[in-house]
């Protein structure tokens, strides 16, 4: 089967935006116009084709980015729908990694919303060219020009309108195309599928000319040939103008802006045209960088069928019908179904059983995939998100996707004994789909602890356990791992004597217990002189102390950073035993800890908040109220970055509180930094709670 669509006629794009800007609806309309779905799915009635997990249809938000293929004007467009919620930024991050261009959807009423800032920063990081689509032009309060001003001010981008609207709110009829200088009016009867080209309405003519002039001026400032023509007063043809807009967009010098109302089916066809005209083909983007899997030498892979096969797995999904699917983007070469590939990241050979082209939730089986395309493979056993698949004789590791560390943990336990085994398996499956979700067993409590990117993230995981795997689970409150240590050097005695007829028990030790610097751990020193404690019993003393370390004297937390020296003791010829000295060691250690002013230590997190100027005071006040210490502030791209140290115990519920305090415009990252002593009043509370 030869290649059906040339590389130059392929587009891999993402649709990104704030929660309610109308992303999924826009994607739905694109699928409708490109002839893929015959009935338009409305998000409002929970039937959108892109939102195919049950939770998404209920909540009306998009969680998983389904990759969909459609055709327009003989081109092939692969669309990745991405979620707009802070807790799912991992999904956005992983989809931006594999697409070439993006359509940023903005609501004409809300303009640039908080999440748009986060997503925009992520797109800047991966240098993704963008087109802005100002949606919902028919809503009350719609303002196209304010939307453009906000893109400039808040996102520090360079928006260049290619259209201006004809009317707005309920009078929104169509648009003026500034390149062709024609008016376009949509027919309501045909659901906007047909439109008439008209002369520009007289009242808009002057404004249209101004904007066209501004468009030519901006574009020619990035193109020397056009600049000469423009300054020389020569006519610039539409084809030249389009080519220059395309180049400036690919270089991320400008962001073309168009308008419409996806829900009312207006402007979607022009959005598709703009994607073909101004978004990059796989051949327009730089070759992908990687390293040779054997020698670590840098390698490039160009978008070409003749180069060795290389692809990046960017999403694992469990499909109810075919099992585990791995979505992958082919950067170079060709792969057939049934063939073997090499997973260079894991060093394993894999067989691709079947290859599917996904359309939202319908699937078409294909025999092979070419460079520049996106498809899903069935049958990969070891591959997880971010792994490189390649030809075994040309093994390469492509730059992987960076995943943030989870910031919130809760204990989870099955409701019934029968669910116990299923819980482990199901959590394992979910963790392979989502690298920002981790599962571990707490050695101290034996509980299963799950960690993720936020409270909503974990809520949805627990929800999926029930829906997809039929496992019912109870979740606990978020937990903090406290520790204990001592603050002064003391000498303590441990004596274990039992005489009650027959053979007794006798063990007696003197210990010096002292604090060590943080991170040193436990150290045992044998300083016995003259055999007052026989050689063979000394390891038993050490063992007894080690066992006592697990349960501190204040609240039963593990004891850390402590040095114990065995200085003296005595023994009994008949009654002494290893057992007796082990108990004596443990008793002496506990006695010593009681006397050595013990304290509780808590984990301190390094918290960085990126916040717009106007919310700065609120954010700092809130961090202070959480016992936080502000370490510094700096300006960064129109926002302030506040660095602080905050106890983990005070950070629960923070993502929700921060979101409401800043209308979701602030983002934060949190990593473990060190342990430090808990203030006395807090320590008393912790002890009271444990002893409860």
Swiss-Prot record:
Binding site for GTP: 17-24, 81-85, 135-138
Keyword annotations of the record: Cytoplasm, Elongation factor, GTP-binding, Nucleotide-binding, Protein biosynthesis
Localisation: Cytoplasm
MF term (GO), any: GTPase activity
Keyword Lipid metabolism listed: no
Domain of life: Bacteria
GO cellular component annotations of the record: cytoplasm
Gene3D superfamilies: 3.30.230.10, 3.30.70.240, Elongation Factor G (Translational Gtpase), domain 3, P-loop containing nucleotide triphosphate hydrolases, Translation factors
Pfam family for this entry, one: EFG_IV
InterPro entries cross-referenced by the UniProt entry: EFG_II (IPR041095), EFG_III (IPR009022), EFG_III/V (IPR035647), EFG_IV (IPR047872), EFG_V (IPR035649), EFG_V-like (IPR000640), EFTu-like_2 (IPR004161), G_TR_CS (IPR031157)
Keyword Nucleotide-binding: yes
Residue intervals of the tr-type G domain: 8-283
Annotated SUPFAM superfamilies: EF-G C-terminal domain-like, P-loop containing nucleoside triphosphate hydrolases, Ribosomal protein S5 domain 2-like, Translation proteins
A single GO BP: ribosome disassembly
Entry's family note: Belongs to the TRAFAC class translation factor GTPase superfamily. Classic translation factor GTPase family. EF-G/EF-2 subfamily.
Known function: Catalyzes the GTP-dependent ribosomal translocation step during translation elongation. During this step, the ribosome changes from the pre-translocational (PRE) to the post-translocational (POST) state as the newly formed A-site-bound peptidyl-tRNA and P-site-bound deacylated tRNA move to the P and E sites, respectively. Catalyzes the coordinated movement of the two tRNA molecules, the mRNA and conformational changes in the ribosome.
Name this protein carries in UniProt: Elongation factor G
């Amino acid at each position: 089967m030869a290649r059906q669509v040339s590389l130059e006629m392929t587009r891999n794009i993402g649709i990104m935006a704030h929660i309610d800007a109308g992303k999924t609806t826009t994607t739905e309309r694109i699928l409708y116009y490109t002839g893929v779905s015959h009935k338009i799915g409305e998000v409002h009635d929970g039937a959108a084709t892109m939102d195919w997990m049950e939770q998404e249809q209920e909540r009306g938000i998009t969680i998983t980015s389904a990759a969909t293929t459609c055709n327009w004007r003989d081109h092939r467009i692969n669309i990745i729908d991405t979620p707009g919620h802070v807790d799912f930024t991992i999904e956005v991050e992983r989809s931006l990694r594999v697409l070439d261009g993006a359509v940023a959807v903005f609501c004409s009423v809300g303009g640039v919303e908080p999440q748009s800032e986060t997503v925009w920063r992520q797109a800047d990081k991966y240098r993704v060219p963008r087109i802005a689509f100002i949606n919902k032009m028919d809503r009350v309060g719609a303002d196209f020009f304010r939307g453009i001003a906000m893109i400039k001010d808040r996102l520090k981008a360079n928006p260049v309108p290619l259209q201006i609207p004809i009317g707005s709110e309920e009078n929104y009829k169509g648009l003026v195309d500034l390149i062709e200088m024609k008016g376009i009016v949509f027919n309501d009867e045909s659901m906007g599928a047909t439109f008439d080209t008209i002369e520009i309405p007289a009242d808009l003519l002057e404004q249209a000319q101004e904007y066209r002039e501004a468009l030519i001026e901006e574009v020619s400032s990035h193109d020397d040939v056009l600049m000469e023509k423009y300054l020389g007063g020569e006519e610039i043809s539409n084809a030249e103008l389009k080519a220059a807009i395309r180049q400036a967009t690919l270089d991320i010098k400008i962001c073309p802006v168009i308008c419409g109302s996806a829900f009312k089916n207006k402007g979607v066809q022009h959005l598709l045209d703009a994607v073909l005209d101004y978004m990059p083909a796989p051949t327009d983007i730089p070759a992908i960088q990687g390293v040779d899997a054997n020698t670590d030498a840098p390698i490039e892979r160009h978008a070409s069928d003749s180069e060795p096969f290389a692809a990046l797995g960017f999403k694992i999904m469990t499909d109810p019908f075919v099992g585990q699917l791995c979505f992958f983007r082919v950067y170079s070469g060709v792969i057939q179904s049934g063939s073997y590939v090499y997973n260079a990241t894991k060093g394993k050979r894999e067989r691709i059983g079947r290859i599917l082209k996904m359309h939202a939730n319908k699937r078409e089986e294909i025999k092979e995939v070419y460079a520049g395309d996106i498809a899903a493979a069935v049958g990969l056993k070891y591959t997880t998100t971010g792994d490189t698949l390649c030809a075994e004789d040309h093994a390469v590791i492509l730059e992987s996707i960076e995943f943030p560390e989870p910031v919130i943990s809760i204990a989870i336990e099955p409701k019934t004994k029968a669910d116990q085994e299923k819980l482990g398996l199901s959590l394992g499956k979910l963790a392979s789909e989502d690298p920002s979700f981790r599962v571990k067993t707490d050695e101290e409590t034996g509980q299963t602890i799950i960690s993720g990117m936020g409270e909503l993230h974990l809520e949805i995981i627990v929800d999926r356990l029930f829906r997809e795997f039929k496992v019912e689970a109870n979740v606990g409150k978020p937990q903090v791992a406290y520790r204990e240590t001592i603050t002064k050097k003391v000498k303590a005695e441990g004596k274990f004597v039992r005489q009650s007829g027959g053979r007794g028990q006798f063990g007696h030790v003197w210990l010096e217990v002292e604090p060590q610097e943080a991170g040193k751990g436990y150290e045992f020193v044998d300083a016995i002189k003259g055999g007052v404690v026989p050689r063979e019993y000394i390891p038993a003393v050490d063992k007894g102390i080690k066992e006592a370390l697990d349960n501190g004297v204040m609240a039963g937390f593990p004891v850390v950073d402590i040095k114990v020296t065995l200085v003296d003791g005595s023994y009994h010829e008949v009654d002494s035993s290893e057992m007796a000295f082990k108990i004596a060691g443990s008793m002496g250690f506990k006695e010593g800890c009681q006397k050595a002013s013990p304290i509780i230590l808590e984990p301190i997190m390094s918290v960085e908040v990126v916040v717009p100027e106007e919310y700065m005071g609120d954010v700092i006040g809130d961090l202070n109220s959480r016992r936080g210490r502000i370490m510094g502030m700096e300006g960064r791209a129109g926002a302030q970055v506040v660095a602080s140290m905050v106890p983990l115990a005070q950070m629960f519920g923070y993502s929700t509180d921060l979101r409401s305090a800043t209308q979701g415009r602030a983002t934060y990252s949190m990593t473990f930094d060190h342990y430090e002593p808990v203030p006395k009043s807090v320590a008393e509370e912790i002890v009271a709670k444990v002893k409860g």
